[in-house]
């Protein structure tokens, strides 16, 4: 609670409450439109799979969702860093875990909260659920009960049972240690390791490190009472006893003398600079206490510039984050129907993650983390959490280990086919907003000008931007009006870190007026007209700030129509050379991540304009790390209608052909991407339908749709945004010489923040 200020707390509550409360819902995977569908789904048709399963229990994987279903189960006795909150209060966390399973590995997960602190009662409640799920993820159960619960359930159930608080941390830690040892020319068996904190994660770390080859006699485990040594009686249990050291050392300070490795799973401030200074040459320091590490990387580097450092935090390099493990470990285990997650599978996961860090980083990952050096070395020993390769690399390694160790039920297994399946299961663009956030966090923050700074949603978005450290917000408005609006949002909210600019009181009015007059003097504007615009029109003033270098990006639109806002800004900021102003939206769905353009500007584009929009949108896709497959959309497909309205679309394809064949640039952009048209949306997105047109040039489903006109583009994107469950981002403005985003008048604070994130990234590219 201390780490969450009032606005974040309120925003979090609103996020969980709005629309349908919570974060997960059940959706159907089969059609339920007709009476026949209903008869097949339930009575009498459902009897058929029931009878087949009764004959052969393995058929449950064939006819039900069990093969892709995980239960996230807790009793709430160790909720995050909040302690014993109880079963009901743990539910938001368990729902969040279920969301991560779906987002990162396409695993359906459901949360179950068991209202008991008695380990035996908990075990009895869970053990009978085996036929319902393909795996069990235990979460937020306090030690030492968590050890007993996991051990017993693993012995009673024939599906994977995995306590992520233990093993997830252990696996990512092991991956980092494998690479850190390699970089410092050490072997695992020779490492002298000190671990501070003797809870679930620490015990699991020791188990896995020993399995990897670390010498047990060279590990010293400490807790709040000091070294866990043989003969100690205070604060002991059988799990600590297992790793009690035969040593005369009694304190953490003594333990760190000449130690090679420190693994912290304890509390902030547990380690001092003096302790670190006495470690061995090239020390390996994993300070993973959350939210604040045992010692900060800055303090470590102050005394040991030869150290390799990892933490649990995303704002430092080498983040030990469980999300790199558990979704993909379960993915691999489920896909081969493993009966357990054994040590061999955990080792395989750790080694796969370690190996991935040594590989060249693909362009889409590098772009997402712009400004960060991602070459295997001291600052990059662990992959970044949003590396889309993780699902293929880790899940495959786990699946193979399950088969080789004899715990997999699936015997007919092709590694190559499995990798292809995993690659198509999740598209990298599904995590694009996270990529943007990481890119922003790796460079100096940009100044983002919010023209309509007196509006509640705009102020809320600016506050979120400040708190998330996405940028330095500048809001245009009158202080007294802003303060009134701020009180509506919540009391005791500070605007610290947000700059307020009142256009009428600015000391830059003369400079901005001079700039604007030079642009408009031959367009019917007198100097006094320009002075009035700068002083009274918030869009003009904000645009002048960006044009004159006093801001890096501009957001506006919630108080004016898109076209009115566009007309204001175009007076101040021109289109980029060889670019047209256009709008696009991104639809992020399970099977398709699609860019739709132009849904903002050109009402009825001619053939050349369509070709230009296609080329520019393909460039946008490339900048997002997407290989563009462009479809020029119509109601007809490849000439099956001779109506005149489709001719311009075919002509646009011919224009693209000519530029592609002659290797010429269209508006300064190479036509070196896949494209075709005219075609219907169904053909563009449906592989089976495209088979009817074997000449179609698209190698896969289109991921860029160029709409034939503004009406169809705007209507289709608004319908998708309103009625589908797909994630939807936009409209996003592209083509100005400076970063400008024009918002919908209905934009919420979260939607404004999303678009502002694009503005931040665009501003980074301006440098």
UniProtKB/Swiss-Prot annotation:
Q: Where is this region: Phosphate acetyltransferase?
A: 431-767
Recall the GO molecular function terms of this protein's record: acyltransferase activity; malate dehydrogenase (decarboxylating) (NADP+) activity; metal ion binding; NAD binding; oxaloacetate decarboxylase activity
Q: Where does a divalent metal cation bind?
A: 139-140, 165
Region: Malic enzyme; residue ranges are: 1-430
Q: What Pfam families does the record tag this protein with? A: malic (PF00390), Malic_M (PF03949), PTA_PTB (PF01515)
Biological process (GO) annotations? Answer: malate metabolic process
Q: What is its EC number?
A: 1.1.1.40
What remark does the entry make about the cofactor? Answer: Divalent metal cations. Prefers magnesium or manganese.
SUPFAM superfamilies in alphabetical order: Aminoacid dehydrogenase-like, N-terminal domain (SSF53223), Isocitrate/Isopropylmalate dehydrogenase-like (SSF53659), NAD(P)-binding Rossmann-fold domains (SSF51735)
Cofactors that this protein relies on: Mg(2+); Mn(2+)
Enzyme category, top tier: oxidoreductase
The protein's superkingdom reads Bacteria
Which reaction equations make up its catalytic activity? (S)-malate + NADP(+) = pyruvate + CO2 + NADPH; oxaloacetate + H(+) = pyruvate + CO2
**Which controlled-vocabulary keywords does the entry list?**
Metal-binding, Multifunctional enzyme, NADP, Oxidoreductase
Q: What family classification does the UniProt entry report for this protein?
A: In the N-terminal section; belongs to the malic enzymes family. In the C-terminal section; belongs to the phosphate acetyltransferase and butyryltransferase family.
Which named protein is this?
Answer: Probable NADP-dependent malic enzyme
Taxonomic lineage is:
Bacteria, Pseudomonadati, Pseudomonadota, Alphaproteobacteria, Rickettsiales
């Amino acid at each position: 609670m201390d780490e969450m200020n009032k606005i974040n707390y309120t925003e979090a509550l609103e996020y969980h409450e709005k629309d349908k409360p919570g974060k997960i819902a059940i959706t159907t995977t089969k059609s339920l439109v007709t009476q026949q569908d209903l008869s097949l789904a339930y009575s009498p048709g459902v009897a058929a799979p029931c009878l087949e399963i009764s004959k052969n229990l393995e058929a449950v994987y064939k006819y039900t969702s069990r093969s892709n279903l995980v239960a996230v189960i807790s009793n709430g006795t160790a909720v995050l860093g909040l302690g014993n909150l109880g079963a009901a209060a743990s539910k938001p966390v368990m729902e969040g875990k279920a969301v991560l399973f779906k987002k990162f590995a396409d695993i359906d997960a459901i949360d179950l909260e068991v209202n008991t602190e008695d380990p035996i009662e908990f075990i009895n409640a869970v053990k009978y659920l085996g036929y319902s799920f393909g795996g069990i993820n235990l979460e937020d159960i306090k030690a030492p009960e968590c050890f007993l619960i996991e051990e017993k359930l693993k012995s009673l159930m024939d599906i994977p049972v995995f306590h992520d608080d233990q093993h997830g941390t252990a696996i990512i830690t092991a991956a980092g240690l494998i690479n850190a040892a390699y970089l410092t020319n050490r072997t695992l068996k020779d490492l002298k390791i000190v671990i501070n904190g003797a809870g679930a994660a620490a015990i699991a770390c020791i188990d896995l490190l020993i399995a990897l080859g670390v010498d047990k006699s060279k590990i010293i485990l400490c807790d709040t009472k000091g070294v866990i040594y043989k003969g100690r009686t205070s604060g002991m249990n059988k799990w600590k006893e297992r790793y009690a050291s035969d040593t005369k050392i009694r304190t953490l300070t003594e333990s760190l003398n000449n130690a090679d490795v420190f693994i912290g799973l304890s509390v902030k401030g547990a380690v001092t600079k003096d302790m670190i200074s006495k470690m061995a040459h090239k020390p390996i320091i994993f300070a993973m206490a959350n939210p604040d590490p045992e010692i900060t990387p800055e303090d470590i580097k102050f005394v040991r510039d030869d150290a390799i450092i990892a933490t649990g935090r995303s704002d430092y390099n080498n983040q030990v984050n469980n999300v790199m493990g558990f979704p993909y470990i379960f993915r691999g285990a489920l896909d081969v129907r493993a009966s357990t997650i054994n040590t061999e599978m955990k080792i395989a996961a750790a080694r796969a993650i370690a190996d991935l860090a040594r590989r060249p980083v693909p362009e889409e990952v590098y772009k997402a983390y712009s400004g960060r050096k991602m070459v295997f070395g001291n600052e990059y020993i662990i992959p970044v959490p949003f590396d889309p390769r993780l699902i293929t690399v880790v899940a495959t390694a786990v699946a193979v280990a399950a088969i080789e160790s004899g715990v997999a039920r699936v015997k007919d297994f092709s590694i190559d086919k499995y990798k292809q399946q995993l690659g198509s299961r999740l598209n990298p663009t599904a995590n694009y907003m996270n990529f943007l956030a990481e890119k922003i966090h790796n460079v100096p923050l940009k100044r983002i000008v919010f023209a309509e700074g007196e509006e509640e949603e705009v102020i809320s978005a600016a506050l979120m931007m400040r708190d998330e450290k996405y940028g330095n917000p500048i809001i245009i408005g009158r202080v007294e009006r802003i303060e009134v609006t701020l009180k509506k949002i919540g009391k005791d909210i500070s605007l610290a870190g947000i700059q307020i600019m009142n256009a009428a009181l600015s000391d830059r009015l003369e400079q901005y007026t001079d700039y604007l007059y030079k642009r408009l003097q031959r367009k019917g504007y007198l100097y006094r007209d320009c002075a009035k615009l700068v002083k009274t029109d918030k869009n003009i003033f904000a645009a002048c700030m960006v044009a004159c270098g006093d801001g890096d990006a501009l957001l506006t639109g919630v108080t004016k129509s898109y076209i009115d806002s566009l007309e204001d800004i175009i007076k101040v900021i021109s289109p980029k050379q060889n670019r047209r102003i256009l709008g696009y939206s991104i639809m992020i769905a399970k099977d398709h991540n699609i860019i739709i353009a132009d849904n903002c500007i050109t009402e009825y584009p001619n053939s050349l304009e369509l070709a230009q929009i296609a080329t520019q949108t393909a460039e946008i896709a490339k900048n997002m790390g997407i290989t563009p497959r462009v479809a020029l959309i119509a109601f007809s497909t490849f000439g099956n209608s001779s109506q005149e309205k489709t001719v311009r679309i075919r002509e646009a394809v011919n224009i693209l052909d000519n530029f592609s064949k002659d290797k010429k640039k269209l508006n300064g952009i190479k036509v070196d991407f896949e494209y075709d048209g005219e075609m219907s949306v169904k053909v563009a997105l449906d592989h089976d339908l495209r088979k009817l047109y074997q000449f179609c040039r698209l190698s896969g489903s289109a991921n860029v749709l160029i709409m034939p006109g503004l009406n169809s583009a705007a209507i289709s994107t608004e319908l998708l945004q309103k009625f589908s469950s797909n994630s939807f981002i936009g409209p996003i403005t592209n083509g100005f010489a400076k970063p400008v985003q024009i918002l919908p008048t209905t934009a919420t604070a979260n939607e404004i923040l999303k678009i502002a994130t694009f503005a931040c990234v665009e501003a980074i590219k301006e440098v």
